[in-house]
Design a protein with these regions (language model features):
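Metal-dependent nuclease catalytic cores that hydrolyze phosphodiester bonds in DNA/RNA
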Residues: 2-224
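Mg2+/Mn2+-dependent nuclease catalytic core
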Residues: 202-293
């Protein structure tokens, strides 16, 4: 077998393929865009993280408390005109709370109480082998929250959390909104007149890359990203990409070389991929280039 060298590969962005779409997280992670590579999905093929081709093709859909808290902070901080936190409603914690949420949705679709609970438990993975025995307990522990949610009205997309998770998210939001360094990054103004600089939130960007081996077409790779926030200052010719991270550990640990989240979750790889994709989009959309700005 001949030796394969990385230098024989060439990765070329297809600028005509770059597109920006407005979509929900649910759509972004749906099967419709499953052929696109994302930074988070790459871990499923990394053998050092237990990845494999099979796992990459059929990635698990994880839903944890940490992810729910992170999503709530992202949505309420970056899109306050669209999202809001519901007040405390004594929502059950962990999977039971998710079951009640799913039951609520299914009941609005016309499911009977029995079928809604069964379907919700199967979807969430909550006592799937003994659902009938758990139904009285589910109703007893979840009814107060279910009824309060039923009576709640809002014109925004509402995020319902357990009381303890609500406290965490509220604290994060209050801290971020009170931090001038953070708010100035998310909502920048120009230094001369104080006018707002173009700022965008939760943009989904897509691009194709042509990969050649020894100058022959090898494969076309499709990449996607969801930009938390990015700004473009047309006068100063500066593009800024901001990515919001939430952590339950001391902030000083984030960049630690061995155990920090930056290394553990490959955020350096994400930073490289996201900044490149955003740059190609701006190059195609605004005609910018690195030499002239």
């Amino acid at each position: 077998m001949s030796e394969i060298k990385f230098s024989d590969f060439q990765v070329i962005p297809i600028l005509d393929s770059v597109k920006k779409l407005d979509m929900s997280d649910e759509m972004y992670f749906s099967n419709k865009f499953a052929q696109y590579i994302s930074n988070s999905r790459l871990k499923n093929i990394n053998p050092n993280e237990g990845g494999s081709p099979q796992l990459y093709k059929n990635p698990p859909r994880l839903q944890t408390t940490s992810l729910a808290i992170g999503s709530a902070v992202h949505e309420c901080l970056l899109q306050p005109e669209e999202f809001e936190l519901a007040p405390k409603m004594n929502k059950p914690t962990a999977k039971l709370g998710a079951v009640v949420d799913e039951v609520f949705k299914l009941r609005k679709k016309g499911y009977s109480i029995y079928n809604a609970i069964h379907t919700a438990c199967e979807k969430i993975g909550y006592y799937v082998n003994s659902i009938d025995k758990k139904i009285p307990s589910i109703i007893e522990k979840g009814f107060e929250y279910y009824w309060k949610r039923h009576k709640f009205e809002s014109t925004k997309d509402t995020i319902f959390l357990s009381d303890s998770d609500y406290d965490v998210v509220k604290s994060c939001l209050d801290s971020c909104n009170a931090n001038k360094q953070i708010t100035s990054k998310l909502h920048p103004v120009d230094n001369l007149f104080g006018d707002p600089i173009d700022s965008y939130n939760e943009d989904a960007l897509f691009i194709d890359f042509l990969v050649t081996y020894k100058k022959k077409h090898c494969v076309t790779l499709k990449f996607k990203m969801k930009a938390d926030n990015w700004t473009i200052d047309h006068d100063a010719k500066v593009i800024t990409l901001n990515d919001l991270k939430t952590t339950g550990k001391p902030v000083g640990w984030f960049m630690a070389p061995e155990y920090g989240s930056m290394v553990k979750y490959h955020y350096n790889r994400q930073m490289a991929a996201y900044s490149s994709i955003l740059w190609y989009y701006c190059q195609q959309q605004f005609g910018v280039c690195k030499n002239t700005g």
